[in-house]
Structure formats: structure tokens, C-alpha cells
Regions:
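NAD(P)+-binding Rossmann beta1-loop-alpha1 motif at the extreme N-terminus of oxidoreductases
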Residues: 1-45
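NAD(P)-dependent Rossmann-like dehydrogenase/reductase catalytic/cofactor-binding core
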Residues: 138, 206, 210-275
């Protein structure tokens, strides 16, 4: 049985991972520094946390389920306890991309992140429909990267990833650099920003007299069909009027050079701000 030391087990993400690892083939040792987190694990799962030294003794994998800003500090604090050949799993590309992981060529660094349940899905179970984050009942895709380490370690890393993010559909292999393009680049800098603009636009039409419920229903419904056509979820074309609105709308909303947010220096700057 493969042993895993789970750091941050009582935090928000660690709690999710604890639930999915319970009952798996992995033997999990839980590490949590906060009293509230330890109490939560004991109450919800009946687990008792152990010191880092005990958790890492004989463990083959260490999962750092801690905030991006703490990854480097936590990794450095247990560096002397990590035996050669051990796998360290990180749940976001930011800290690895920023160089916050210790320089230990004898360790395997594996990075994995969920895509979250897609907007277009075939879920019918009410619990799955409500699981918008993923990892509980709704199926989702994931991305993973073998940052360093033997190629044969990828299979174990992917098995861990499929377990902690279950239920999983497609598992995509990417590089850490590609994962940084996906987040924060694509998902946060672009998508979250544009969604925030959409919310502001909805608030604006409400301020101009449209009933709030009508504005929300109209926006979300149009997001569904427009998104289905744009992302080729279903065949179809926009009306001439819609295409004309896009032609004149994009220049009014977007800078000509907006794609520079994907340039390496911009991605690096974005990651520095969050780590």
C-alpha cells in the first residue's frame, strides 16, 4: 500500500482531499497545524493528525494542500525529512512556476489541478448538478505535470490526482509552463475578468430600469446558447445582427493588445502577485 503524507489536511482543500482519499488504496497520514482543522478532521472523519516527522516516515508521497503563499515555507520546513525518490504533489502551478520548491533533484515534483465540472455536461443526479467545484459528485477533467523526476513516476502521480479529484473524466498531461498559461492566464486573468465585466453589465442594465430578475435570466440564458455555439458544443451560427454587434462590441470593450497577458513576463508577473 502506498503511503501519503497529507499536509494541510484540515484546511478547505485538504478536507476535500481527505474525503476522497478515505477508502482508497492509499494509506494517508494527516498533518494539520491548526487546532480547528484537527478538530474538524476528527469530527468529520474520525482521523487523528500526526506530526510531520511521523507522517513522512516511510511515506512515498507528500501532498502539500496549503495556500500558494505557504508552499515554499512548508516544503522547506520538511525538506530534511523527504527521502530521495519521494514524490511531492502540489495542487497549483503558481508556486512551482515561481521557483518556490526547494532545489532537490532527487525528489519528484508532480503538479495537478482540476478543470472543474464543465458547463456543458450530462449530469442528471441533483447532487452532481449542485457540485460546481467538483471532487464530490460531478465529473470533471484534470491537468497534471511531471515537473521533475523519473518518467515512470507519472503513473503514480496521475493515480493520486484521479483519486483526489474524483470523479474524473479526461486526464490531460501538460507542462508546468502550460498549466500557468491555463491558470492564472486563461481561467483567472481572462475568464474571471470577463465574467466580472458581464456581471457589471447586468448591474448596469438593471440600473437603467430593467428588472433585476429579468436581466439575470436573460443574461444566463444567452450565455448558455451563445457559449454552446462559440465553443462548438452544438452546430449553429449567429444571426447577422449578433455578428455585427460582436464586430463593433469587441473594439469597444477590449484593448488591441489584450493577448499580451499570455506573454511569459506577464504570466510571471501575475504569479508573483499571488505567491
Amino acid at each position: 500500500m502506498t503511503s501519503i503524507a497529507l499536509f494541510g489536511a484540515g484546511g478547505k482543500m485538504g478536507h476535500r482531499l481527505t474525503r476522497n482519499l478515505k477508502g482508497s488504496r492509499f494509506e494517508v497520514r494527516h498533518v494539520e497545524v491548526s487546532e480547528a482543522g484537527r478538530a474538524r478532521l476528527a469530527q468529520d472523519f474520525g482521523f487523528t493528525c500526526v506530526p510531520a516527522e511521523e507522517a513522512l516516515a516511510g511515506a512515498e508521497v507528500a501532498i502539500l494542500a496549503v495556500p500558494d503563499t505557504h508552499i515554499g515555507k512548508v516544503a522547506q520546513s520538511v525538506l530534511h525529512l523527504l527521502k530521495p525518490g519521494m514524490m511531492v504533489v502540489v495542487l497549483d502551478a503558481a508556486a512551482p512556476f515561481a521557483g518556490h520548491l526547494p532545489a532537490r533533484p532527487d525528489l519528484t515534483y508532480f503538479v495537478t489541478h482540476p478543470c472543474h465540472p464543465p458547463i456543458f455536461n450530462d449530469e442528471t443526479d441533483p447532487e452532481a448538478k449542485k457540485d460546481r467545484f467538483g471532487g464530490v459528485a460531478a465529473k470533471q477533467h484534470i491537468v497534471s505535470a511531471l515537473m521533475q523526476g523519473p518518467e515512470e513516476h507519472y503513473a503514480l502521480g496521475e493515480e493520486v490526482a484521479r483519486t483526489i479529484w474524483a470523479p474524473v473524466m479526461r486526464s490531460h498531461r501538460v507542462s508546468v509552463e502550460q498549466m500557468a498559461l491555463l491558470e492564472p492566464g486563461l481561467s483567472e486573468t481572462v475568464v474571471a475578468s470577463l465574467l466580472d465585466v458581464m456581471r457589471e453589465a447586468m448591474d448596469e442594465v438593471v440600473a437603467r430600469g430593467v428588472p433585476a430578475e429579468a436581466a439575470r435570466d436573460f443574461l444566463l440564458g444567452h450565455m448558455n446558447i451563445l457559449g454552446a455555439v462559440i465553443f462548438k458544443e452544438q452546430p449553429g451560427v449567429f444571426s447577422d445582427a449578433c455578428n455585427k454587434a460582436i464586430q463593433f462590441g469587441k473594439p469597444a470593450l477590449m484593448r488591441d493588445d489584450w493577448k499580451k497577458v499570455f506573454e511569459p513576463e506577464e504570466i510571471a508577473a501575475s504569479i508573483r502577485r499571488i505567491t
